[in-house]
């Protein structure tokens, strides 16, 4: 009986292991890349106010990194409609400037319109208006943040946000979508939930996967759902409100049916990005100050030109009349000034001499008084000491015998007290040691409670007040700098704490002409490079020592560099700027040059078969940092291209 049970149990284990191993090879093969490719956008959606471009998330490189990408180009006065995703996002502003608004549930609306004064209005109209109508006129919303070129923006999952281009130039932003984040409870397919508008599908590969799943569904319920969804797609309903029952929404939102009809059936032209014809007026300190300045300018410009001309003519006439008078006054004053100045100088000298004499007399009197007081004090002290010694001698003669007896008793009492104190001190020492241990344990427990409380803070201390922006393109922000090669600046959970929740970070690299970013690898993260400006040569080598990428990268292209793959960059004649997104909030790199410097010379000599002088040259020649400048611009120091 035991053998059949063991046999059946082993079969079950084999089946389970085969099922598990059937899924694992697919995940492992995603990063077994023999060749990397420079990726360009695969899908393009044109809207009234801009363009949205996406990369196919089924690309092997992107599946290895577990991310997806979007690129939004918003024209002036363009509004990217409110939307949210089920995974965190990192947005880098490549060009332009704009406004960002997020709507976090549970956070207060801190921006409010000022109450309009109703003193000038008719009291009959005021009485006819209800309080609800007055509240509708006064808008309030959550904080609006302004961004510009070089900013990194962190968007939490499930939080709706919108962007608006208030500048005169186009706004270009690249979005990293961390689809494999632990915060994503759905599958890693990229998807975006639009609250408004009639947006087109940004990731067709996701729609294709959903279509295949519908075909595999069985039963009448699945067929009915598929038909219902097909009807909705034919009607063009793609926002999250279009699928609800209109009557249910009217009751839930407590609004008219006309409003619900507008929400569920938007205009076909309202896609991802719409154009605001008259501009967007929102509550913000910046816009309010600009409006006040604009209101003051027309008032000043509205003054009649004739009045200004008359005032200028009157000023010129007054100046002409005042010129001869001012000259006569100046001549008279110049004639009188020498005598007055001499008289004033004489008076000042007399006053100074008198004040000096008075001061000297006061000093002499003060010295005399102090000497007299000191002499009196010394004599009094000597007399007091003599009297006190006489009294002590007389008292000591009469009390000598009594003190001898009392001293003996006091000595015995002191010995007994000392013995008791020793015993008490020993007990206290033991007790104090125990108390210290207990206090240390309590302190450790309190620290643990504080850490738990910090990690469990409410919305008011995390999302509502979290900092979402950080500019990493400023030259003063550089973490590594070589004036002949370029600069590198990083943003991570230490500089932007919200990234600790996202488990993401980024590096901004700006290489000057022919500047070199020496070979290095990412220790604990995958890296995705997006070129923002210029052109450069990039080489990537895998664990087998094979070159998986050796080509030029230009503006607008993506390149995935897997973890621990060695990579090197060199800029062209136009320079080379790129943003490198990392899948770790504290991503670290390891330059090969620093590794050589950390290894003893004997080890390197035996490992590479070098002489000691060659090893010292390998370790200590050139720059210490990863940014290297070529020796001369006349020679060609570009990275060689391997066929």
From Swiss-Prot:
Residues 314-323 have a biased composition (Acidic residues). Keywords: Allergen, Disulfide bond, Seed storage protein, Signal, Storage protein. This is Conglutin alpha 2. SUPFAM superfamilies: RmlC-like cupins. Sulfur-rich seed storage protein. This protein found in the seeds of many leguminous and non-leguminous plants is the source of sulfur-containing amino acids in seed meals. SMART domains: Cupin_1. Belongs to the 11S seed storage protein (globulins) family. GO terms for molecular function: nutrient reservoir activity. Residues 207-218 have a biased composition (Low complexity). Hexamer; each subunit is composed of an acidic and a basic chain derived from a single precursor and linked by a disulfide bond. Component of globulins complexes which accumulate in seeds. Residues 228-237, 298-313, 324-333, 357-369, 634-643 have a biased composition (Basic and acidic residues).
